[in-house]
Amino acid sequence: MYRYISVSEELSSPYLGRYRSFGFAAQREAAGHWQVVCKVSDVSTDPVFVENLAARCTAGQLEPVHLMDIIEDALI
């Protein structure tokens, strides 16, 4: 079983300065514990967008190998 969670990050860019962004962590349940199997950083500055997409990925039990494609499609 997989679950996807939003991850808040404080980042810095030479063009933007400091900013808060949100990424994803894919976790797999193993022996009663959740282990991170994949992380994608700096997806969006909109926390609701990332949380909603994470919930859809969890509900659909998305394989982490497809996460980048799903994120790209959602951003277009």
Indicate where each model-derived feature is located.
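Short N-terminal "domain-start" leader segments
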Residues: M1-G23
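Residue-level marker of intrinsically disordered, low-complexity segments enriched
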Residues: R3-I5, W34-C38, M68-D69
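Exposed acidic/polar residues on beta-strands and adjacent loops within beta-sheet cores, strongest
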Residues: S8, R20, A25, S41, ...
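Generic structural motif
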Residues: E9-L11, E29, V43
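Surface-exposed loop/turn and secondary-structure junction residues enriched for glycine/proline
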Residues: P14, V43-D46, V65
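Short aromatic-glycine-(Arg/Gly/Cys) micro-motifs in beta-strand/loop hairpins
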Residues: L16-V36
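A short, exposed loop/beta-hairpin motif centered on an aromatic-Gly-Thr core
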Residues: W34-V48, C57
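Compositionally biased, intrinsically disordered linkers/stalks adjacent to structured regions
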Residues: E51-I76
